[in-house]
Amino acid sequence: WXDGYFVEVIVRFNP
């Protein structure tokens, strides 16, 4: 993950 791991997780769950 990058620095914004939270953002990456949200993108993964986004359709």
Swiss-Prot record:
<dbReference type="GO" id="GO:0005739">
    <property type="term" value="C:mitochondrion"/>
</dbReference>
<dbReference type="GO" id="GO:0005840">
    <property type="term" value="C:ribosome"/>
</dbReference>
<keyword id="KW-0689">Ribosomal protein</keyword>
<keyword id="KW-0496">Mitochondrion</keyword>
<protein>
    <recommendedName>
        <fullName>Putative large ribosomal subunit protein YmL12</fullName>
    </recommendedName>
</protein>
<dbReference type="GO" id="GO:1990904">
    <property type="term" value="C:ribonucleoprotein complex"/>
</dbReference>
<comment type="function">
    <text>Putative component of the large subunit of mitochondrial ribosome.</text>
</comment>
<keyword id="KW-0687">Ribonucleoprotein</keyword>
